[in-house]
Amino acid sequence: RIRALQKKKEINPQTLSLQSLPGISAFTDRAVIGMLKAFAGIHRDNKIRNWNNDFRLSAGVGAFEVSMIFGMDAGWAVEGAVGSEYKIDATYLSPHVNMASRMMMASKQYGVQIMLSQSVQELMSDVANTKLRHLDTVTVKGSSVKQRIYTYDARAQGVDFFLISRTDEQADFDAERYTPRIWDTDPDLLSMRQHISDNFLNVYKKGHRAYIQ
């Protein structure tokens, strides 16, 4: 019965209008890949590597490391300008922007680098969905609607992204010819997920089912 309920997934009303847009799956996939490429990029940057090795930054506080966490939600937003005549910045106002911020902050609690909302997961391609891991089903503050949250298991430890660096021209070329196959062929995506084994996923699914029940 539980499996049947899980299979009959409730579609988030927020994504219904987005799902009708042509090419939305590829668009959403590429947005997530953009985050993953940023994650790989900061671990491939020579200046950041030099900062990590600078004893002045780590003196008295232990090892110093530059890292990033990401949160993503899908929906509408209003763009506007804030600031003064001396400095103007763009800002985005929307409950979806707030949700993305909450996803990012919650990633610390779940011990992951990247967290995606159900709204994003429902828009991604079938191939991309096989790479996501369902972390939990939660009710976000200010809302009574339950929402599934997901992660893409990205880890930099034990990965030398410098060995798989590419020119800017090659990166642009690969981005323009996107296909869902990239999830199984891109060196960056494969390397940051190399710590995920079939055994881990099987054990996790058993534990996750018990947790959800």
Would you name each region that the model predicts?
Residues 40, 62, 67, 76-79, ...:
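Intrinsically disordered, glycine/charged-rich C-terminal tails and inter-domain linkers
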Residues 1-30, 41-95, 119-129, 143-148:
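Catalytic core of nucleotidyl cyclases, primarily class III adenylyl/guanylyl cyclases
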Residues 34, 38:
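Acidic, glycine-rich loop-and-strand cores that form catalytic or ligand-binding grooves
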